[in-house]
């Protein structure tokens, strides 16, 4: 919601911004905005900056009918993407050797352990297994896989 801005420009709702360690910016918002932030969650050697308007980007078909995938970033076996689930779409049982984090942005996602509405955050540990499916309205999720157990960059010292 709203518009996030910095000296590089304005980022309307739906923009994915990735600023790796060593970069800097002066963020602000004139009218206010809601943003999702993960600081210092970068694997060693991962230095790519990304600024992507997801509302205009080309989505790809997913691994099952009813899924659309928009890759956001990939490095060393760690992948971040948006995944759009059509209503009632089911994904087969699968395991995440490197763990998985999900932020439900729209709709409802379900699995054997629960029902996750918009705003829900899931952190599934390494080697977790599930069979997710979308609710009646479908779902849009932000998902990151392969990063739990990765070698992280050290936090900066003041």
Provide a role label for each language-model segment.
Residues 5-24, 110-130:
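Short acidic-glycine-tyrosine-enriched beta hairpin
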Residues 8, 27-29, 82-83, 92-96, ...:
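Short histidine-centered beta-strand/loop micro-motifs
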Residues 77-79, 84-92, 108, 117-118, ...:
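A structural signal for the main folded, soluble domain(s) of proteins
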Residues 10-11, 21-45, 126-152:
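Ligand-binding loop in jelly-roll beta-barrel domains
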Residues 16-18, 69-71, 80-84, 101, ...:
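Conserved hydrophobic/aromatic beta-strand scaffold that supports enzyme active sites
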Residues 1-6, 87-89, 96-112, 118:
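Glycine- and acidic-residue-biased ligand/ion/polar-headgroup-sensing regions
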Residues 32-77, 157-158:
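A short, N-terminal "cap"/entry segment at the start of jelly-roll beta-barrel domains
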